[in-house]
Every structure is written in C-alpha cells, then in structure tokens.
C-alpha cells in the first residue's frame, strides 16, 4: 500500500488513529496537501489515539500547538506562514528530541532544515468539490524506522 483512498472525515481520522497507535516516539510526520485537504482532521485522529482530550485546532496562526497530556506529546505545526523558511522562532531540534510525535503541515517551506528521517503523507482531493471528502493519501517513508512505522500503519487497513 503506497496509497489509500479515503471517503470520509471518519476514515481520515481512522488513518490518524492508526498513525498515533503505531507511533513509537521521536517520530516526524510530514503532511502535504492543499487547504482543506484534511491535514488537521488527520491530526485529530492522531490525538485521539494518543489519548489527548483537548480539542485539536489548526496551528495556522500559532505555528505550533503543543499537546502534552496524552500517552506521549503531540506537536502540531503549520509552516505555511514560514514561506521564507526562517525557523529561528521554533526550537525544532528540541521538539524532535522529545519522546513525542511531531506533525508538520506545509513541510515544503522548511524541508531542507529537517532530518532525512520521516514519514510523509501527501493528501490529494479526488475531485474539485469543496463538499467532497474523497481523498487519495500517498505515503513516503524515509529511513528504516519509518518504513517499519508505515508497515504498522498498513496493518490497520488490511
């Protein structure tokens, strides 16, 4: 499975739950996709799997939202406002060193500054209708531990 068809917000959250449940800590997840593709919906599923009770909101205006009260910390980041790639306001090495899960939306703006060890999901709309929840999610695992992580995620969809 290098791609997965998603037909509803519930299925997107199910994928998020699979990601969260199979996370081992010190994980880096990159989420690519247009506005409204489902990146935050996916992250809500991750938070549920990590037993985070607070509502998950898009970090578009805050850049980073921290959720530390679950089974492991979740750091939800949105790099859309960092088009210049200036990470000086974010302690990225500190977040990556924690035993948590770092989720980065719009990673293309900072990809050169990230370790070459991550799982990337590219979320694409199947059609142009804003009402449609149909998506294709493509997976790319970089590094051996992320290939193992992806194989664990796939088990939830066999």
What are these regions (language model features)?
Residues 39:
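Conserved lysine of the Walker
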Residues 1-18:
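N-terminal pre-Walker A segment at the start of P-loop NTPase domains
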Residues 60, 66-108:
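Conserved nucleotide-sensing/catalytic segment adjacent to the nucleotide-binding pocket
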Residues 28-30:
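Short hydrophobic/aromatic beta-strand immediately N-terminal to the Walker A/P-loop
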Residues 32-34:
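P-loop (Walker A) phosphate-binding loop of NTP-binding proteins
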Residues 2, 93-158:
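Short phosphate-coordinating micro-motif centered on Lys-Gly-acidic
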Residues 48-58, 69-72:
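Post-Walker A helix-loop "phosphate-sensing" segment adjacent to the P-loop in P-loop NTPases
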Residues 19-26:
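Phosphate-binding P-loop
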